[in-house]
Amino acid sequence: MKRRIAFTAALLIGSLTHTGHADAAGGRCKQYEPLLQTYAPRRGWDIGRMSRYMFRESRCTPHVRSRTQDTGLLQINDINLQYLTRKMGRPITVEALRDPSTNIAAAALLCTFWRNAGRSCYQPWAVN
């Protein structure tokens, strides 16, 4: 009986913390792919790859915050807030990064920064 209650509680907690929109079979965040497509042509992004990174980083949950100060769908780190504020022309805060459009736009700006530095756009999300 205790095991059944614990399992039910785990399912309930999981349903409260997950958006339920992820394509679990493909490990992608398909509902956010149109936003990724907005930035893909200018950044040379592979939509499927970025969608899989998004799934891995946040499980398609825009409000997620890690214990290492990473926020949102693509887990943008706080160390980038000043740079992003300067480049986007408006205050970019932790709360702002919880907005899917802002988070993906921020990732696109960081991609440009890394490419200009001769690095891969995918480097922050790649797994060694």
Regions found by a protein language model. Give the residues of each.
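Export/targeting segments at the very N-terminus of extracytoplasmic proteins
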Residues: 3, 13-60
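Catalytic and binding regions of secreted/periplasmic enzymes and modules that target cell-wall glycans
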Residues: 29, 42-43, 63, 67-128
